[in-house]
Amino acid sequence: MFYCCGITNKGNRDHNEDALMIHKAYITEGTLEEHIPSPFIAAVADGVAGEQAGELASSLCLRLLSNIKYNHTTDLKERINDVHEVLVQYGLENGAYLNMQTTLCGVAIDENDRITTFNVGDSRLYRYRNAMLRQLSRDQSLVQLLYEKGTITNEEKRTHAQKNIIFPVLGNIHNAPQIDIHSYGEKMQYGDVLLICSDGLSDYVSSTEIEEILSLPRSMAKRLKMMSDLSLEKGSKDNISIIAISYYDDK
């Protein structure tokens, strides 16, 4: 069995363009907790600011994703590309929503409890294991490219003037998104936590700070709220969404 806890809030903005999904349930505000067996999918979507109807793009994306009947034979890249095409078509048919876009980041756990991750954009997926946090996703952003070329340091990524420039994401009518899929072929270990978040958290709260909060003897819901509160204290001007997933033996 898996315990999943997610929180999403508008932060310092007047509306929330984020959404999160755990299995068949998705929300655009508040807290969601589930105790569920595999298979299931969990994901965060962050509607792109400055484009039409980011909040519709993220919520529609997750509504479509929640309809996928996932197992180890599912072609996730194809299914996510189907979501992209629906968003594009919706915008073409409804002019007010033309070019609405969203990031998408998450994990699919099959009926054998094996993990596959997926990512489009700059939302993030981490794994917390043995008191250490490791980023499993790769940011599809200009600053990540500059970092990989050695132009800027990892620390400079968070404060760079062009940190908000990302590569094409779901719903982009001009360029197809790059859908990153990685199958790990391994199961979660006891004590592991998979953490999915929008950049409203990761742009302001460091990996070390996330590690410190996850190590605390508090409920997961309280720890996620602590992360969200810390992000706001450090000046986050974005929506904030976080999902944590852990494994336990129910026998």
Could you tell me what each predicted segment is?
Residues 1-251:
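PP2C/PPM-type serine/threonine phosphatase catalytic domain
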